[in-house]
Amino acid sequence: MSPETDKAKRTRTNVRQSKFGCFTCKARRVKCDEAKPSCRRCLAAKRHCQGYPRGAPSESSSPSTATSSPLSSSPPSTLSSASSSSPIFLIPDLLSPSSPLAKLACTVLVQSPRRAKNTLELEFWSRIVPQLTHSVPSVQAAVEAFGACYKEYVLKSDSTTTGLETTKRYIKALKLAQLDLSTMQHGPLPCMIACLLLASIEAIQQRLYSGHVHLNGALALMASHSSEEATPMIDMEYVSLFRKLDLHIATYAVGIAPHLPPQPPITADELLSGPPDKSLSRVLHSCYHFISAGYAYKYTSRRIIPPELLIEQGRQLSNMRQWLEYNQVPSSNTCDQDESLLVLRTQCLAALVYASCVLDPRETAYDCFGPEFEEIVTSVEALPPNINQDQTLRYGDLSTLLSYTPEMGIIHPLYFVARKYRHRRWRRRALHLLIKSGREGPWCGEIEGAAASSVIWAEEGIAYNASLDLAGPEDTVMDDPINILERNRVHVSGPVAVDDKEDEYGNVESNQMSHKRLTKVHIFRCCDIEAMLRDDGHQPRFHPWKGSNHWEEWMDPLEPVS
């Protein structure tokens, strides 16, 4: 290379830097030309410009707009039309009259614990969603509906009109989302965000079937607009974010596969080189597809299990063990930086144990995974507390805000430990953490904690609603899981809404005004596993207790755990 060429390359550092680039270019890590109202790089790439951060020069002062081509002129209906004038990031006087609800919603979504969120996901809730709240009516309506729901059903600030404001705003948001879906005026991403917020509203009100429908709608919309065959209309970073939400479906409902189809098998190079959260999301997505297929064979004779299912089980376990090996938590005291990795490891460990036992009908099979269960508990205990929670999670004169995050976090792993690890002290440590873990998507720590308590009472022969505190020092003999016999162990359990009625299509409809919809915990226990396998284990079944004489079932009230 000649000296002249080398010198020319070095002068590149003198090019004007992009300090106020649009959110889309920043997420893609490309230089933005800062054209207003939409940057030309986004338009040329057929992407929706998400607007500019606070402090960015206005259209009149932007040097790049003076010579912009006609392509840079965006119609008023585009996604970033609101970003063409003054800064719009969480400015109170630019919000609608219902701004307190939007501010409450954004505060909850931004300031809840990080858990497994990566940097892009943190920016998504702190920047992209507030930006779209100003520029897209359907997102604004959905955000305000979420704020109303949180205020009425979580904070319970006005018990006399519970649900009325939420219902009114929910209907408005639903109509605007349907209008956006029919026209795609602002592209798919605002529609997906609106669907996700509507699903969160249903989850907070414990109408999980309706929430499932909204989440599936967002995932179907994402799948149809992120195809690699055509020009994708959604950044792949956001595809990864929504793909993670699909795991809620598989973890919450027993034997249900994720909505999105499985991806090609992940390679060792991809496990090693990819970001931990993205590689784990892909591993878990494939794993829960396997678990869904294998669950039907859990209570069958070993000889009728297809050999390819056993081979697939080995492949899934190998992938998860490799991920755990590649993503160790550093021994140094860096909990703040490792919070996301700690949470990801708990999710992987829970899936590893579940996949290992999914083809074994005996609950005693879980006793072999004490180290994995105990690492889940110690990892959650090592998470840093929410910084200045009393100050940062307050809203006006309301009480301290309870955390809510749409993404997966720690509730499912803790709930899994409390139910399946029969060590007396470790399961109580998991239960103690569970009831304080807030809300994550369809999961509620308080509700899952109450359901897990019923399992502990049943398995340990303790009177219903008795204290679960253990007096005295640790006793390795008494605490050993082997003390709980197979015939006393609960196989399946979960919160149910017994007051709900099914319509002619089997859909569950709840009383709109009811605060609590999950009022009971449904428990299934096999009295004689060997006799059940002998009499009923000749064909795969998703509900082995139906038509069998070897199962007992009952319901306990869901009572708060002190």
Set out the residue ranges of the language-model regions.
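Intrinsically disordered, low-complexity acidic/Ser/Thr-rich segments used as protein-protein interaction/activation
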Residues: 55-58, 78-136, 140-149, 154-312, ...
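Alpha-helical solenoid repeat scaffolds, predominantly canonical TPR units
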Residues: 169, 176, 214, 372, ...
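Cys/His-enriched microdomains
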Residues: 20-23, 30, 37-40, 344, ...
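Residue-level signature for tetratricopeptide repeat
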Residues: 132, 150, 201, 355, ...
